[in-house]
Amino acid sequence: MKVNIEIAGLPLYKTFGKTKKIAFEFPGKTLKELIDAMVRKFGFEVKKFLLNNNGDIDMDIRVLLNGATYLSENRMQTSLNDGDALIFKAPS
C-alpha cells in the first residue's frame, strides 16, 4: 500500500531526505503498521519524535487523515487505504 505523508512542525526534515512530504509504500493496512515500517526505514528519529514511551503516537502529535479527520482514540488501529494522505502535526 502507498500513502502520502506530510510532516508539519516536526524535526524530521533531514530524516525524510530534506522534504516534508513523501509517498511511502509499506506492507500493511493500519497506522501502526505504517509507523513500524517508517521506523524500520528511517530509524530512531521517527520513533523519537512520533511515539511515546508506550509505543503509541504521542498524544501531543495531531494526525490528520485525508485532510478531514483528526484521529484521536485508538489511533494506531486506524485502517488505511491505498492513496490516503496523512499529516503529522506538532503541537501549536
Name each model-derived stretch:
Residues 1-92:
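Ubiquitin-like/PB1-type beta-grasp interaction modules and other compact soluble beta-rich domains
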